[in-house]
Each structure stands twice: as C-alpha cells, then as structure tokens.
C-alpha cells in the first residue's frame, strides 16, 4: 500500500508518470534484493574444487565492477533526473528517499560480497566456492535490467497519449513494463533452480546450514529441500 501511495503522490505531482510507472520504478529494488540475497546463499551452496580458485577471484572482481557500474550508470543519472521533476516538495522527497535507498543498497552489496568471499577463501582447499553463476545473475540484473527499466521509467518522453486500438500508448507501455518485470522474476527463479540442481553436498538443508554457519531461512529451506528430493545428493 505504501508503494501505491508514494506512486500516486509522485505521479500527481509530476504529471509525467502514471501511478503504475512509479510503482514499477519503486519495485525495481525488489529484484536487487532477491538476486543478491539468493545469490549470496547460492555462493555458499555450490561446492567446487581448488582449480576454480582463480575463477572465484575473477568473478568476485566482476561483482565489484557490476556494483560500480550500477552506481555510475544507474543511480547517479536517476538522481540527476530528480531535478527535472516539476512537482510538490513531498513528491520530490519521496523520490529522493527512493534513490538514497538504492545507493545504500549498492554499497551494502559490496560489503556483503567482501564478507562472503573472505569466508569462502578460508574454507578447506577442496571447498573453495566460486560464484560465477550467482554473480553473472547479479551483474545481469544490475547492468542490463535495472538500468534499462529505470531509463524507461525516468525518461518517458517517448510515451505519447495517442490512442491506439482503444488503449493509449502510455497504457501499452505501462503493461509492457510490468510484464517484463514479471518475466525477469520468473527467470531469476529458474536460475536458482538450475543452480540447486547442480548441487552435490550435505544431504539436508540443516546440514548445509550448520556446515556453513548459515541462518535458517524457512522459505529458502523449502525450495532447497524440494530440489534435493528430486536429485541424488551425495554426502560430502
């Protein structure tokens, strides 16, 4: 409800974005949370051997680059666009708070990545954990997806009010944005399942959690357990 109320105030004040567009923009933070949180768990679930150590370090650098690119190519331009909004002070405050959260999250991602990889490098050499798939997913989301969607939503100059087959072009654009967000979320889930299907290690989520000192996440536990039941998992 809060997202909808913010979207309504913002849209009413600027007269350039619809509530649906604003709500979609606010929701762009959600895939970032899902991708990074899930990715960091997957990092510690994909067990590999020492010959992947160099790959681990390379993909770690990729993660740092992705965060840097996100800040420079997405957050800063989006923040600059706030100055073009002609609206109420309340709407501008809501918008500014939104981008402050994006900035703080991008900083937090790098911090968490540092911690995850520092822990990974302390494992027994037969349990070095590369994060190629998880980090590629993060990079794809941040650079290719979020950046594009923010650009579309923040720069709606190409959206016209011309009626086309009973719908305005603006309405069609809104629907397309929402559908792309839904497809992206589906792709994330499929990617997670592929990672789990390739996992061979401890035979239960509890063992995994204890071995790696992970917090118990019940929703994630159910997903992992469901996948483990479908495949033959060898004890580590």
Swiss-Prot record:
<keyword id="KW-0934">Plastid</keyword>
<dbReference type="GO" id="GO:0009507">
    <property type="term" value="C:chloroplast"/>
</dbReference>
<keyword id="KW-0150">Chloroplast</keyword>
<protein>
    <recommendedName>
        <fullName>Uncharacterized 27.2 kDa protein in rrn23-psbC intergenic region</fullName>
    </recommendedName>
</protein>
């Amino acid at each position: 409800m809060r997202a909808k109320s913010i979207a309504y105030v913002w849209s009413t004040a600027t007269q350039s974005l619809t509530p649906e567009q604003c709500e979609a923009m606010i929701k762009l933070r959600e895939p970032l949370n899902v991708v990074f949180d899930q990715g960091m768990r997957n990092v510690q679930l994909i067990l590999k051997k020492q010959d992947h150590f160099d790959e681990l370090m390379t993909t770690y650098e990729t993660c740092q680059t992705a965060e840097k690119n996100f800040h420079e190519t997405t957050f800063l331009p989006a923040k600059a666009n706030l100055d073009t909004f002609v609206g109420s002070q309340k709407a501008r405050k809501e918008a500014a708070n939104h981008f402050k959260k994006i900035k703080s999250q991008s900083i937090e991602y790098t911090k968490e990545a540092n911690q995850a990889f520092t822990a990974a490098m302390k494992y027994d050499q037969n349990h070095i954990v590369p994060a190629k798939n998880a980090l590629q997913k993060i990079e794809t989301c941040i650079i290719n997806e979020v950046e594009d969607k923010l650009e579309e939503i923040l720069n709606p100059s190409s959206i016209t009010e011309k009626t086309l087959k009973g719908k305005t072009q603006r309405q069609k654009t809104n629907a397309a944005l929402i559908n792309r967000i839904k497809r992206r979320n589906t792709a994330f889930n499929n990617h997670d399942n592929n990672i789990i299907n390739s996992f061979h290690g401890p035979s239960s989520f509890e063992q995994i959690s204890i071995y790696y000192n992970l917090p118990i996440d019940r929703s994630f536990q159910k997903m992992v357990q469901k996948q483990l039941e479908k495949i033959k998992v060898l004890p580590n």
